[in-house]
A protein has these predicted regions:
Chain A
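Phosphopantetheinylated carrier protein domains
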Residues: 42-65
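Alpha-helical residues within the helix-turn-helix
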Residues: 15, 32, 50
Length: 80, 394
């Protein structure tokens, strides 16, 4: 895992989800561990798209499958 | 109040306003200096965090909803524990506009960054009913939950309609009031271009040199309760809603009906509802926006109903500015504070009452007062008129 990329991911998660950086680990589950519902995840993904300058948006079908930080991070990396 | 015979007690209230957060600070603010040199007054350094479980929850609420929840917290704390079924505890709330700051921010984001960047929280944050929804969810109020959006009359209409829910027997308690936070750059431009705002940036209700209103913001929330239930649980009765009136000018989208005919009819409806005559009213908390047209029509209406200089009149808008849909709520709170303090705050900013008016306007210094029924009036763009008559508590 690219630590520099992940640090940028953590910063987005801290800003949008208002959680501690230490909570944002690959195994963390959005709903159970980060108290983030589906709209929170949408907002996080929007922030990630902006932070990483993704030219294509992450489609809803892909988002629906995401339950953990690690999964979300992998999707972002795959779009870079 | 007409209905099934249930009297309506006020057992708690809370206030958030630029001149003070919390009832005591608000009262001190009302006795302080008026507004000069600004087109809007806003709550300085507002911090929503004390009123939310988490920073994320606070960020998901528009400032208008944050104000509402803050005022609700003070109101519920004062009211204490009510013996009311959730299904018979309603929420009748007011706003003129709703989450306008959120809408404006997101419009800018859409234009600058595209549709994909528009927040998924735009809709729940901008919708006018968000404040009432938030209050009902936080306190588990499962009775009717309706939001009234009759512009500057909304706060007064909400209090009147909330009281009616109890008088009619539908509810045993209702959280009511109003919140507003609408001084965005776009809305200020609109109010300014329609020449409603003071070009000199001063609010001076009924003054000979008044030239428009100053935009305000804030919220007030009241806990209304069936009087006998409040007495039975030993609650302190802070005041009583004795009657309310609501009607329409059906005349013009922004200008009041000439001679204040709609306002006259509205005050008379409230008096009839309360079973009182004009001579029973000892204080008018006026709409008194400081606009040339409103204040002229309102002064004429008051003279018609109460006689020339027949009743003490005050307007808080010299201090608070005009908080649109929250105005009626902020002003009902002024009436309750006057009842507690036995003082009528002066109409700040006003030094020379318009010589064309024959009203007994309290200016300069607070006036000693023996609490007795008071009427609070508010009138909204669209020709909406609202009056509510509040009596002292125990």
């Amino acid at each position: 895992m690219d630590q520099e990329l992940f640090n940028r991911f953590v910063k987005c998660a801290v800003d949008t989800l208002k959680v501690d950086a230490a909570q944002v680990v690959p195994a963390a589950r959005f709903k159970e561990d980060l108290d983030a519902d589906s709209l929170d995840v949408v907002e996080l993904v929007m922030a990630l798209e902006e932070e990483f300058g993704l030219s294509e948006n992450i489609p809803e079908e892909e988002l629906a499958e995401v339950t953990t930080v690690g999964q979300a991070f992998d999707i972002v990396v795959s779009k870079l | 109040m007409q209905g099934l015979g249930h009297r309506v007690a006020i057992t708690g209230y809370g206030v958030v306003a630029p001149c003070g957060i919390g009832k005591e600070a608000y009262w001190n603010g009302l006795l302080g200096p008026g507004i000069t040199g600004t087109r809007s007054v806003e709550i300085p350094e507002w911090d929503p965090l004390p009123y939310f479980e988490s920073a994320k929850d606070a960020r998901r609420s528009d400032r208008v909803e944050q104000f509402a929840l803050a005022a609700a917290q003070e109101a519920f704390q004062q009211a204490g524990t009510l013996n009311v079924e959730p299904s018979r505890f309603g929420t009748i709330f007011a706003t003129g506009i709703g989450g306008l700051h959120t809408l404006e921010e997101q419009v800018i984001i859409r234009v600058e960054k595209g549709e994909r960047r528009v927040s998924p929280f735009l809709v729940p944050m901008m919708m006018a009913n968000a404040s009432g929804a938030a209050i009902s969810m936080r306190y588990g109020l499962q009775g009717p939950n309706e939001t009234i959006c009759t512009a500057c009359a909304a706060g007064t209409h909400a209090i009147g309609y909330a009281a009616r829910q109890i008088a009619w027997g539908r509810c045993d308690a209702v959280a009511t009031g109003g919140s507003e936070c609408a001084a965005t750059l776009t809305s200020l431009a609109g109010f300014s271009n329609m020449t409603a705002l003071s070009s000199t940036g001063s609010s001076k209700p009924f003054d000979a040199t008044r030239d428009g209103f100053v935009m305000g913001e804030g919220a007030a929330v009241f806990i209304l309760e069936r009087y006998d239930l409040a007495v039975a649980r030993g609650a302190k009765i802070l005041g009583e809603i004795l009657g309310a009136g609501s009607n329409a000018d059906a005349h013009h989208i922004t200008a009041p009906a000439p001679g204040g005919t709609g306002a006259i009819a509205c005050m008379n409806l409230a008096l009839e509802d309360a079973g009182l005559s004009a001579s029973d009213i000892s204080l008018v908390n006026a709409h008194g926006t400081s606009t040339p047209l409103n204040d002229a029509a309102e002064a004429e209406a008051m003279t018609h109903v109460f006689g020339a200089r027949g009743v003490a009149v005050t307007s808080g808008k010299g201090v608070t500015g005009h908080a649109l849909g929250a105005a009626g709520a902020l002003e009902a709170a002024q009436v309750l504070l006057s009842m507690e303090k036995k003082l009528i705050p002066p109409t700040a900013g006003t030094t020379q009452v318009d010589p064309a008016m024959t009203i007994d306007l309290v200016t300069g210094f607070a006036r000693a007062w023996t609490p007795a029924p008071a009427i609070s009036n508010n009138f909204g763009f669209g020709g909406h008129n609202g009056s509510v008559i509040i009596g002292p508590g125990e």
